């Protein structure tokens, strides 16, 4: 069953009249993971942020965005806020930017839960701890009393995921969630998303420039370049049998990097 339909989506910078995204179309079914790939500036993030109205006001949006039967572009800002977090959760690139540095992470998470649920304080704490345990966050009560600066980037990232899961959204949008992390933490966060994909009835849009990450988690893939969607299909067709020259370029670049790394590890790179 289709959860999200995006039709003829166009995003324009109203200050300069410059089109940033042009005539983008895609769908997402319930429980499916859609990978969105492309270089920096290709329009990946603003396309996905437009689903819940998180772009700056200067960016004008036209077209259709239908989420679970509701036209998102016809909603007022106050109506859209009801969808954010509860029905559509967003996991940002850097956990440090998602939390107010002057307040404990627990207080911020509790406030979000109170806005979107009718749970008591005790129920909220129990629910948050349950999902923090699920994501291997040790000593959750201590973490909830911590300020953001006291926690690592990987911990903050997993806290965002825990909060998202606690609200039981129909869709999680993950915007480059592994980019700002070290290699080991990247692996842990990616494994968390893969586990969510297996065990939760939740669709995901996973934005990344890392083709290895997308290959591990996506069911279908769309490729963006200069604000246009230039190729889409199953993970197998796009990442292993691409048709567009740009997709082939991305894949060949990734292969060259991997081959060079293998040569370095073998010690057969010479000046």
Curated annotation (Swiss-Prot):
It is a peripheral membrane protein. ATP binds at residues 38-45. The keyword Transcription regulation does not apply. It comes from the Bacteria. Keywords: ATP-binding, Cell membrane, Cobalt, Cobalt transport, Copper, Copper transport, Ion transport, Iron, Iron transport, Membrane, Nickel, Nickel transport, Nucleotide-binding, Translocase, Transport, Zinc, Zinc transport. It holds the Pfam family ABC_tran. It is an enzyme of class 7 (translocase). PROSITE patterns: ABC_TRANSPORTER_1 (PS00211), ABC_TRANSPORTER_2 (PS50893). The keyword Cell membrane applies. Residues 6-251 form the ABC transporter domain. NCBIfam families: opine_ATP_CntD (NF047578), opine_ATP_CntF (NF047576). PANTHER family: DIPEPTIDE TRANSPORT ATP-BINDING PROTEIN DPPD, OLIGOPEPTIDE TRANSPORT ATP-BINDING PROTEIN APPD. The complex is composed of two ATP-binding proteins (CntD and CntF), two transmembrane proteins (CntB and CntC) and a solute-binding protein (CntA). This is Metal-staphylopine import system ATP-binding protein CntD. It comes from Staphylococcus aureus (strain Mu50 / ATCC 700699).
């Amino acid at each position: 069953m289709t959860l999200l339909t995006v039709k003829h989506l166009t995003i324009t910078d109203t200050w300069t009249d410059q089109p940033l995204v042009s005539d983008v179309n895609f769908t997402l079914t319930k429980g499916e993971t859609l990978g969105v790939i492309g270089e920096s500036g290709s329009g990946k993030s603003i396309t996905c942020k437009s689903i819940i109205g998180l772009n700056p006001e200067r960016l004008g949006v036209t077209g259709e965005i239908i989420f679970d039967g509701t036209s998102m572009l016809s909603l007022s800002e106050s109506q859209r806020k009801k969808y954010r977090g509860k029905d559509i959760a967003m996991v940002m690139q850097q956990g440090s930017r998602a939390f107010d540095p002057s307040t404990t992470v627990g207080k911020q998470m509790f406030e979000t839960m109170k806005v979107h649920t009718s749970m008591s304080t005790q129920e909220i704490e129990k629910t948050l701890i349950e999902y923090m345990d699920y994501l291997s966050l040790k000593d959750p009560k201590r973490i909830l009393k911590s300020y953001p600066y006291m926690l690592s980037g990987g911990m903050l990232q997993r806290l965002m995921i825990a909060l998202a899961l606690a609200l039981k959204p129909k869709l999680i949008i993950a915007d480059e969630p592994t980019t700002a992390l070290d290699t080991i933490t990247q692996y842990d966060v990616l494994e968390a998303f893969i586990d969510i994909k297996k065990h939760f009835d939740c669709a995901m849009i996973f934005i990344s420039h890392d083709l290895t990450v997308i290959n591990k988690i996506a069911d279908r893939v769309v490729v963006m370049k200069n604000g246009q969607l230039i190729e889409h299909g199953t993970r197998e067709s796009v990442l292993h049998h691409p048709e567009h020259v740009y997709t082939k370029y991305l894949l060949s670049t990734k292969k060259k990097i991997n081959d060079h790394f293998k040569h370095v590890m073998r010690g057969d790179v010479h000046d």
